[in-house]
Curated annotation (Swiss-Prot):
GO CC terms in record: mitochondrial membrane
Ranges that cross the membrane: 1-21, 42-62, 71-91, 121-141
Protein name, UniProt field: NADH-ubiquinone oxidoreductase chain 6
Membrane topology reported for the UniProt record: Multi-pass membrane protein
Similarity comment text for this entry: Belongs to the complex I subunit 6 family.
Keywords: Electron transport, Membrane, Mitochondrion, NAD, Respiratory chain, Translocase, Transmembrane, Transmembrane helix, Transport, Ubiquinone
Upper taxonomic lineage: Eukaryota, Metazoa, Ecdysozoa, Arthropoda, Crustacea
Reactions listed under catalytic activity: a ubiquinone + NADH + 5 H(+)(in) = a ubiquinol + NAD(+) + 4 H(+)(out)
EC number in record: 7.1.1.2
Length: 155
């Protein structure tokens, strides 16, 4: 999972189109949320919803700015990416070819106790955050529907 995040961040350096950059940012956020779900499901869910809302607004804005641009892939720039990815795998995980159950990785059943360790104070904060984000979503929808024009013309 960490290797996929490193690979996506390497490819983000080579992207020259904003929509491809937005898509890779979305995939990277999704992978980080999947990694965080083992620690706390609520934090990963809230992080995903916040990033998804921001990325969707950014996607609408960027797609209205660059509607007819084509993707241009430069294959020569990928020649240095492959050795960098292999080296990053070797540095981040010295035994990435030899994964075994005795390598010290935690299984999802080890995190059951952590997931249920939510007290009433943090649940109240999560509830307020969810209500606040929902109200912000409703306000943005109402603002966009009241003008009945594209997002680009508002700027």
């Amino acid at each position: 999972m960490l290797g996929s995040i490193v690979v996506i961040s390497m490819f983000m350096l080579l992207m020259n189109h904003p929509l491809a950059f937005t898509l890779s940012l979305f995939v990277q956020t999704l992978l980080i949320c999947v990694m965080l779900k083992n620690v706390s499901l609520w934090i990963s869910l809230i992080l995903f919803l916040i990033f998804l809302g921001g990325i969707l607004v950014m996607f609408i804005y960027v797609s209205s700015l660059s509607a007819n641009e084509k993707f241009a892939v430069d294959l020569t720039s990928f020649m240095w990416v492959v050795p960098t990815i292999v080296l990053s795998f070797l540095v981040l995980n010295k035994n990435f070819m030899f994964m075994s159950p005795s390598s010290g990785y935690l299984y999802p059943t080890d995190f059951v106790i952590i997931n249920f360790n939510v007290n009433s104070l943090t649940m109240l904060a999560y509830s307020f955050m969810v209500v606040y984000l929902f109200l912000a979503l409703l306000l943005v929808i109402d603002f966009l529907n009241s003008n009945k024009k594209p997002l680009r013309s508002m700027i």
